[in-house]
Design a protein with these regions (language model features):
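Membrane-helix/interface signature in polytopic inner-membrane proteins
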Residues: 202-216, 258-298
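Loop-to-transmembrane alpha-helix initiation sites
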Residues: 56, 132, 161-162, 182-192, ...
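Transmembrane helix-bundle core of multi-pass membrane transporters
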Residues: 143-264, 399
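Alpha-helical transmembrane segments within multi-pass membrane transporters and channels
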Residues: 100-141, 354
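Transmembrane alpha-helical segments in multi-pass inner-membrane proteins
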Residues: 298-311, 315-378
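Cytosolic-side transmembrane-helix boundaries in multi-pass membrane proteins
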Residues: 1-34, 197-227, 289-292, 366-400
Length: 400
């Protein structure tokens, strides 16, 4: 009886205003999607648009996980990741196409280069105490120049991967491929299993928190979250089933997102990132190795950039000098729009995913209504500014 009373006291009462603020970006995402669906006369809701959204924005989700870890340490970002994608793409093209190293060895080499760069960058920032924006700006300038120079050996300033079908199938292929417009049952089965897992995890997490005496949301709120999450998964998988199957890049994105969601929420090292970003001096005094956390943030970012480079050049079917352009802006925008604090110490992988999806929907929607590229940049700039202002105002209200 006492346990039951204790559990009831740990249940938060539903506050409509607080709930609205907490889910503001999710609500905006839905409204923006509806807006562009109307403006494009339904094209945004077609199965091919769902597939395009995933394929074209895979790099944002992957880099966003890395940028999240950097921003958690105190609002730091990596300005070099886009240029590093260009350099890695050029080197990957040389290894796979020019030097004939084969797909497996070339991919391992690209990952190794990413790790080496990450160690060097992390050491400069964490131990030599070079400011992150200076260290990564140097990389931004150097890598773009190196990548363009390497690609200059080709008469077309690009290296095609059309003769590397194994590589293309790994990152830009389709699982359970069927003709477009035909129901893909394996795809739907995956969707049903994933939706069921979401519902199971929501209530398992609720039971665990109650057992440990932590606060939880009202039962109807958790039920609503699980139903909404399951519905979104089923809708996306249905659209992909009608579009021809599951893009292989979605598997890579799912693995990265789920892994980093686990790291940031369930591990000690993940919690240390939040502690360092919240108050670095307090973190140091409490025994957290702050230099190690900063080192790991940039090592991790470089490693994920290697994976993003693979998905990018595979989608382009070529390595070219434009690969990675403005990727650092897209990744940091996804984090900020998704609620990651610009000053560090707060944010989540789920929020980043919502932010990345919102940026992707805006990009795809503006493309489908043929909005001029310059105006597209203006819109994205205002979206980013609005997200930062929202973050600042929310923090001020919390202090009152």
């Amino acid at each position: 009886m006492q346990n039951k009373i204790a559990n009831q006291s740990n249940i938060r009462r539903s506050n409509p205003v607080a709930t609205l603020k907490k889910n503001a970006m999710l609500i905006i995402l839905v409204l923006v999607y509806i807006f562009f669906t109307i403006m494009t006369k339904g094209r945004m809701f077609k199965p091919t648009s769902f597939a395009s959204l995933i394929n074209q924005n895979a790099y944002v989700y992957i880099l966003g996980c890395g940028m999240l870890m950097c921003m958690l340490t105190g609002g730091n970002i990596d300005l070099s990741c886009g240029a590093f994608v260009c350099l890695l793409g050029a080197l990957g093209g040389m290894m796979m196409v020019i030097w004939k190293w084969g797909t497996a060895l070339s991919l391992v080499a690209m990952l190794a280069i990413g790790v080496v760069y990450g160690c060097g960058l992390g050491a400069l920032i964490a131990y030599v105490m070079v400011p992150p924006w200076i260290a990564t700006l140097a990389g931004y300038l150097a890598f773009r120049g190196l990548g363009t120079s390497i690609l200059g050996v080709s008469s077309t300033n690009s290296i095609s991967f059309k003769d590397s079908p194994d590589f293309l199938s790994i990152f830009s292929g389709t699982l359970f491929k069927t003709p477009e417009g035909q129901m893909n049952m394996p795809c739907m089965i995956v969707g049903v299993v994933a939706a069921a897992l979401v519902v199971l995890l929501v209530f398992k997490n609720r039971a665990t928190r109650l057992r440990k005496g932590y606060e939880v949301d009202a039962l109807e709120m958790d039920a609503a979250k699980s139903v909404l999450g399951a519905a979104v998964i089923l809708l996306v998988m249905y659209k992909l089933a009608m579009a021809g199957g599951i893009p292989t890049v979605l598997v890579w994105v799912a693995v990265v997102v789920l892994l980093y969601a686990f790291i940031t929420s369930k591990t000690t090292i993940g919690r240390h990132f939040y502690v360092v970003g919240g108050n670095i001096e307090a973190a140091r005094l409490s025994g957290v190795n702050t230099k190690r956390i900063m080192f790991l943030a940039y090592l991790n970012m470089a490693f994920l950039t290697s994976i993003a480079a693979m998905t990018t050049i595979s989608r382009y079917t070529a390595a070219n000098a434009d690969a990675g352009k403005n990727f650092e802006m897209d990744a940091s925008s996804a984090c900020v729009v998704g609620g990651v604090s610009a000053s560090g110490g707060a944010g989540s992988v789920l929020g980043m995913v919502i932010g990345a999806t919102l940026i992707g929907v805006i990009n795809l929607g503006m493309f489908q209504i043929n909005l001029d590229a310059n105006y597209q940049r203006v819109v994205k700039g205002f979206v980013l500014l609005a997200a930062v202002v929202f973050d600042i105002l929310s923090k001020k209200q919390q202090k009152l």
